[in-house]
């Protein structure tokens, strides 16, 4: 499955399969080096990006705890 393209993710969607297939919809200032497909969010100011990769494996922890 390789390296997860994000260390953490707040807006993560994963399948219920084992292993899970996960996507992260967080808006980032820049994608990580591990992200292969980085997409710019249209009309974002300042510019924001979303890693378009699908990761197969253990879901990432959340970046921020929701209170």
Curated annotation (Swiss-Prot):
Stored PROSITE patterns: BOWMAN_BIRK
SMART domains for this protein: BowB
InterPro entries attached to this UniProt entry: Bowman-Birk_prot_inh, Prot_inh_BBI
Any one Gene Ontology molecular-function term assigned to this protein's record: serine-type endopeptidase inhibitor activity
Pfam families noted in UniProt: Bowman-Birk_leg (PF00228)
Keyword list, A-Z: Disulfide bond, Protease inhibitor, Serine protease inhibitor
Alphabetized Gene3D superfamilies for the sequence: Cysteine Protease (Bromelain) Inhibitor, subunit H (2.10.69.10)
UniProt superkingdom: Eukaryota
SUPFAM superfamilies documented for this protein: Bowman-Birk inhibitor, BBI
Site (Reactive bond for trypsin): 16-17
Gene Ontology CC annotation, any one: extracellular region
Family: Belongs to the Bowman-Birk serine protease inhibitor family.
The protein's name in its UniProt record: Bowman-Birk type trypsin inhibitor 3
């Amino acid at each position: 499955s390789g390296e997860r393209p994000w260390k953490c993710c707040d807006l993560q969607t994963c399948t219920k399969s084992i292993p899970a297939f996960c996507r992260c919809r967080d808006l980032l200032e820049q994608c990580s080096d591990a992200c292969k497909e980085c997409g710019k969010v249209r009309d974002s100011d300042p510019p924001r990006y979303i890693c378009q990769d699908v990761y197969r494996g253990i879901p990432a922890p959340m970046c921020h705890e929701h209170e």
